[in-house]
Amino acid sequence: MEDLEGKKILVIQTHGVDTPTRTYSPVYYAIAAAAMEMDVMIWFTMNGTNQLRKGEAEKIELKPGSGVTLKTLLDQALDAGVKLSVCQQSMDLWDMKPEDLIDGVKILGATSIIDLALEADHVMYF
Amino acid sequence: MSDVGIVRGCKIPKDLYYSVDDHTWVRLNDDGTVTVGMTDVAQNLAGPVLHAKVKKVGLTRAKGKPIGTVESAKWVGPIKTPVSGEIVAVNEKLADDPQLLNRDPYGEGWVVKMKPTNWDEEVQELQTGEEAVQKYQEKVEREDIKACEHVE
């Protein structure tokens, strides 16, 4: 595990609240990478964007009765130092304004994601 | 084991030093090394541990840096060392039986042994004895941490 510190991982999440079972793992992997001292960003785009609307992630429970929601994981990710970013163009697709986003999310454009993909040591997309 | 404090069913042995916010403990050994592990409260928060990865012997870590990572079904995160130093031994058993962390967090579930490099100063920031129990009590109340369940 020693050489991983500072490596850059970019996670691209294209799935959202319409497919709840596809929302957890990418966030979980991002938290794991952060725990391993990597520099991690999740980029939410396409349908992935809608889970960042205030109040949505709370509705998605990992396992019924567990009390652990997608919001729990997104909060854990922020606490762990994972950067959350969202595609500006996809926000328009979902009629979302900056004030609709949960706290801690940075809005980026398409050119930024290309730069980030080139800078990352590895890109994971879902 | 010597005197043990109980906080919401979680055991807090009073002879250890704690970094309450990071849920870790330290035992000062006779040879000047320290043993580091995660607390009963931590194992309870994580739930049954599925995987534990521990850093390697020889690595020097500053206080607050991870000495390993722990994953359960609902949580994954670092174990942050409460003291600076060099890792001189790791608990190899955790790779095959990570739930030692749940069953015996202060004994067989230890994580690493370290040769501390700044013990005299850093110990001042840790809590021990009744003070540790009190600080943990305040933390579990403030954060409404659930009562401990012990995996047998």
Predicted features, each with a name:
Chain A
Residues V11-Y24:
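Short, glycine-rich nucleotide/cofactor-binding loops
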Residues G6-L10, D121:
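Polar low-complexity intrinsically disordered regions
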Residues G48-L62:
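N-terminal beta-loop-helix "entrance" segment that forms/cooperates
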Residues Q76-A77, S85, P98-D100, K106-I114, ...:
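A short aromatic-anchored loop/beta-hairpin motif
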